[in-house]
């Protein structure tokens, strides 16, 4: 399992620990990932994804999983999230044709 957010694509970053005497040693900044079960309103289904805490706040701000996925770029999303996005798009298209 990679240390990468499935929705935003945020992964580990590198930097330095800097001591008082200005000696720099390499270190990694890992994203704060947590497993989250997210509900898709249009599909009526829940999905378990490993996302960052920042992505969870963004989901709340955007109004849910469906609206976040429809506005997200495909390059950021994991293969699992891309499949969910395709299902949401297909469901929205079917609903638009029925109405």
Swiss-Prot record:
Name the UniProt key words of this record, in alphabetical order.
Ribonucleoprotein, Ribosomal protein
What family classification does the UniProt entry report for this protein?
Belongs to the bacterial ribosomal protein bL28 family.
What's a GO cellular component annotated to this UniProt protein?
cytosolic large ribosomal subunit
Protein's UniProt name: Large ribosomal subunit protein bL28
Extract the PANTHER family matched here.
Answer: 39S RIBOSOMAL PROTEIN L28, MITOCHONDRIAL, LARGE RIBOSOMAL SUBUNIT PROTEIN BL28M
For this UniProt entry, the molecular function terms from Gene Ontology, in alphabetical order, are:
structural constituent of ribosome
Q: A Gene Ontology biological process annotation?
A: translation
Report the InterPro entries cross-referenced here: Ribosomal_bL28, Ribosomal_bL28/bL31-like_sf, Ribosomal_bL28_bact-type, Ribosomal_bL28_sf
**Pfam family for this entry, one:** Ribosomal_L28
């Amino acid at each position: 399992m990679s240390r990468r957010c499935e929705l935003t694509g945020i992964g580990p970053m590198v930097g330095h620990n800097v001591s008082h005497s200005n000696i720099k040693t390499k270190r990694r900044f890992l994203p704060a990932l947590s497993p989250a079960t997210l509900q898709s309103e249009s599909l009526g289904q829940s999905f378990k994804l490993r996302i960052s805490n920042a992505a969870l706040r963004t989901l709340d701000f955007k109004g849910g999983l469906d609206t976040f996925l429809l506005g997200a770029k495909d390059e950021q999303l994991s293969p699992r999230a891309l499949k969910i996005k395709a299902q949401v798009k297909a469901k929205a298209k079917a609903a638009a044709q029925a109405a």
